[in-house]
Amino acid sequence: MRHHTWLWLAFLPLVWLVGFVALSAQQPKTFKGRLSPVPIDFAMQATIAGSGSVTAVLTGSKVTISGTFDGLKSPATIAQVHKSPVRGVRGPNVLDLAVTKTDAASGTLSGSFDLTAIQVADLEKGRLYIQLHSEKAPDGNLWGWLLPQENKR
């Protein structure tokens, strides 16, 4: 009987650790971004303006993205999630978001996706960003990187 008690005490920390890892893997992680004008030259000043914010919540491999924008000089057309090779550099589109216009200059964006393991890693490393396009700026009007936020306990 005494042997079983020692065996149980030896495996108790392992059981606790496995349970803790399983619980922490499902804790939501929050990412936020500030939408600001894409890099522009003098000729683009008449067409590119605005600001906004975006939040992404990752639970397991599912991400839910929501955001708002305003101050555009023409109506929004599309919003996309792009993957950048490094933060601050444009990259290819990987996901399409829904855009709802409140009026000609403002609106919301949203989407919910099941990410691949590579996309989750890219999100956690700050390689994913949102790009919002508009009628007068079809190559992008606003953009913002999704950066991890610390969970306050």
Name each model-derived stretch.
Residues 1-5:
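Positively charged n-region of N-terminal signal peptides that target proteins for export
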Residues 9-19:
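Bacterial N-terminal signal peptides
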Residues 19-79, 83-153:
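Metal-centered catalytic cores of metalloenzymes
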